[in-house]
A protein has these predicted regions:
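Solvent-exposed edge beta-strands and adjacent loop segments
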Residues: 44-57
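Short, Gly/Pro- and small/polar-rich lid/capping loops
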Residues: 1-39
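Conserved beta-strand/loop scaffold segments within soluble protein domains that form the structured core
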Residues: 59-317, 331, 338-361
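Generic N-terminal initiation segments characterized by hydrophobic and/or small/turn-forming residues
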Residues: 2, 42, 49, 93, ...
Length: 361
């Protein structure tokens, strides 16, 4: 499929190569026999969640784009529509997980969440495993009504031979809040795009994301927060590690449109480079169609500081242990937001394994 994905809302100089995802990030062609059945999935739905027969009729596009959204809906081999009634607060997280393998190499999921007025819920999505040319493609749509609080945690622990697409679309009501935690640690190709529409007053969107790119990995991200209601707030913060010949593009857009009086938006990225052959590109963008707004963006790129490394080694740490310490410091704020302890431990172990593998290389 050759559709344009992860399009920057306002294009910049073409030579920068950040206006949209590269050709290597394109969605896969649909096999003649289809993608086959989904892998065996584990679903944990605490009391208070209801399964619906159908999702939303119309919805805002994700960060990846409307064409990709339509493709994901059409080709999904696993569909889950969830709803929580007005005033219901659910303390235990719902967990949806899948594991790719040779027999079931493709997981294409379509998930919708309808959080009614003053409800509260947490949804955890996990994908693991891998298969040659395996595909993990996910579209999640969240509607948070007035006063609702929704937390979405997405953890990707795929092998390097799999490919990953993760699209998120969010609509918030008055005083609603959606928090997204996105952890992308594997897959040879990882394409993610989140788009939140804060068109009601006092809506809030928070994104905490981490990524790990190694070898010849291709990582492409596009996160957008659209503000039209007044007193809206978004916080988008990303931390990443790149090694080998990994190629990464991150687009972060805060779009203040007319009517977004007293809107506030902050975005930042902190990248640690372990190799001189990586390619790291970041395109922070703040669009202002309203005067009384506050927007800030920051990007930090660093390598292993030789002085810090010497200090840590003088305290008895090996270089591999020092690397792990520096990565842990960057990833910990996001990992700590995973509400399932066993999954937090699994993520930490996966990060350590990937770092050890890089140090051996």
């Amino acid at each position: 499929m050759n559709n344009v994905m992860n399009r920057l809302p306002v294009p910049t100089w073409n030579r920068c190569g950040v206006n949209s995802a590269p050709a290597g990030a394109a969605l896969p062609a649909v096999p003649a026999e289809g993608f086959g059945p989904a892998p065996a999935a584990e679903s944990i739905l605490p009391a208070g969640f209801a399964r619906l027969d159908a999702g939303f009729v119309a919805f805002t596009e994700s960060g990846i784009g409307a064409e990709a959204d339509a493709w994901l809906v059409e080709n999904a081999n696993s569909v889950c529509h969830l709803a929580v009634s007005e005033g219901v607060e659910i303390n235990e997280p719902a967990v949806l997980s899948a594991e790719l393998d040779a027999a079931h190499p493709n997981a294409l999921t379509y998930v919708t969440v309808d959080a009614a007025k003053n409800s509260r819920l947490t949804l955890v999505q996990v994908v693991r495993g891998g298969a040659e040319h395996g595909v993990s493609a996910n579209l999640t749509r969240i509607r948070a009504a007035e006063g609702a609080v929704v937390k979405l945690v997405q953890v990707q622990l795929l092998d390097g031979n799999a490919r990953r697409w993760n699209a998120v679309a969010i609509e918030t009501g008055t005083g609603a809040k959606v928090e997204q935690v996105r952890i992308e640690l594997g897959a040879g190709t990882a394409v993610c795009g989140a788009r939140a529409v804060l068109d009601k007053n006092r809506g809030e969107y928070d994104l905490d994301a981490v990524y790990f790119g190694a070898g010849d990995d291709l990582l492409d991200f596009n996160d957008v927060s659209v503000h039209t209601g007044h007193d809206t707030l978004c916080e988008m913060h990303t931390a990443g590690v790149l090694s080998g010949r990994a190629d990464k593009i991150l687009r972060g857009t805060i779009d203040f449109r007319r009517g977004a009086v007293h809107g506030v938006g902050h975005e930042s990225e902190d990248v640690l480079l372990f190799s001189p052959t990586v390619r790291n590109r970041t395109a922070p963008l703040i669009l202002c169609g309203e005067e009384q707004v506050e927007g800030q963006h920051a990007a930090s790129v660093g390598r292993l500081d030789e002085d810090k490394l010497y200090y840590l080694r003088s305290r008895g740490l090996t270089e591999a242990q020092a690397r792990r310490l520096m990565v842990d410091a960057r990833f910990a704020p996001s990992i700590e937001k995973i509400p399932v302890e066993s999954l937090r431990d699994e993520v930490r172990q996966d990060v350590a394994r990937r770092l050890d593998h890089e140090s051996l290389d």
